[in-house]
Structures are given as C-alpha cells and as structure tokens.
Amino acid sequence: TEGGEYVTAWNNVYIPPILARLQALIDGNLTLTQSDVSQIPYLCGFESQITGRLSPWCDIFSDEEFLQYEYFQDLRYYYGVGLGTDVPKTMMTPYLNALMDIFVQGPSVTGKREDGSAFNLPKLLVSFLNDGQLNQLVAASGVFDEQRPLSSTHKDDSRPFVSSRFTTMRGTIAFERLNCVGAGNSTNVNATRFAQRTPPIRRSNCTQPSPPIQDNQNATYIRIRLNDAVYPIPTCNSGPGSSCQLEDYKQYIATKLENQGSWIQNCNVTTPGAPTKVKGASFYTDLSSPWLSHVAP
C-alpha cells in the first residue's frame, strides 16, 4: 500500500514549501510537481551510491528537508508493510518462529539434502530479502513493540523507528544465539549468528518467566542487531548485552504466531489441496522440497 493515506497526508505537509522554494529558482517553462520533488532524494542517494561520491542532487535539499523526507520513508514502511498494518506485519512471523526452533535445537542442527543424506547446518545462516520483507521481519522481531503509531502530520524526532537506520543498501537484521556463563555479568560469550540481508531503543523492565540464571551457570540468549547496532526487546532485555533468554523469546514469538490466527484465512487461500500448515523456514533443514532450486555461481 506504500503507506496509503498516511503518506499522502505527510506529503501534503512537507513537500509544498520545498516545491515553492525550488519553483522560485527556476527560469523558463518548467513547472515542478509534488511527485518531482519527492524523487529528488532518490537521485541523491542512488547516484552517490553508483558513482562513489556525493551527488550534486544532494545539495538541493536542506538537512531539515532530508529529515522530513526520511520521515516520509518511515511512514511508507510503517504503514505499508510494518507495525501500522494488519496482515503485512505478520508475514514473517512463521519464518521467525521456525528460525527460533533451530536456535532452540542448538548449533549442531542437522538437515536433509535432496538425495536424503544428512548435513550439518552451518553456524552462520544467511538469507537475502528485499526491503519490504526486511521491514516485515523487523516488525515481527518485536524490537519496536513500544513504538507509538506514527503521526501523519507531525514528525517525532525522538521516535525509535527510523527506517533509514536499517533499510539501507545491504541493510541487515541479525539474530545472535549467545551461550553465556552467569546471570548476565560475564563477558564469556560464544555466539552463533543468523543474519538477514540502527541507536538502540529505550529499555523497559524485563518480563522473564524462565527461572533466574544462577552465577556460573550456562544459559542461552538471543540478541538482535539492526545494521550491527543492538536493539533490545522492550519487555525482555536483562541478559548479557541487552539480550533475552532464548526460551522466553521463543515463547514470545510462538504466542505471537498463535494470536495471528489461521494463515489459510489470513492469506485468503482458496486453492483446493493447498497446504494447511505454514512451515516458515523449512528450506534451512530440508533441501528435498520440490519448490527449491539450485543457483549456479
């Protein structure tokens, strides 16, 4: 939906002053539109990326105008595929639930090849997503659960959700499985990292139903990074490095998935014989699925 009426309303707030300023600088028969103005930052970003130097297009907007444009992108993702939506924000929950099942099993998980033989999953799993799927996964992760609905008329400069901090060229969300000694004060951490192809949000008290971890006792935690910056789960971040105990996070995601209802109904599946169970991330452990294919380098 590209943010729908929220984006339209914000465009009507921030673009007209920019349009008037730029139009006053133009001599001749050229009339700019709001759409023209909204595309200029894209020219700035993409040309800078392609050429490796700052594009002259970047000089057209002031710093504040770029921040207003940044907020436009926040609205586009938040109300297009993120927490401001109904179904789109849930689309990556089955995947994340299946990924947490792999985390719970540990770093020695085995899978099945196409010929039926077994293999050990690597300690680093990498998946490549587009920007919309990345935002859906971020929404499912829970790191922005305390974000209030974004206003379509006022830019909140203290908002936790700033899409430009993670929806970048090669933007990433990483889920780290940490095995630590003690109750969170140890620096002895062994990490297994699961990455998907960012300052931390404020913390609240940790809601931790699992038994307290005793000193000198091993425990397993989950920590989330957006473009390498740690983003704590607002309701569970008392572990080492603002992490959450893995059992608690697994239950948090499982409960979220259960509350999202039937995926047959969510996706309006009407095809006879269609699968009734969402597997989420079976492609990590089962390479024999008929819909998988190999891509030669």
Regions found by a protein language model. Name each.
Residues 1-125, 129-297:
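Signature for phosphate-centric chemistry
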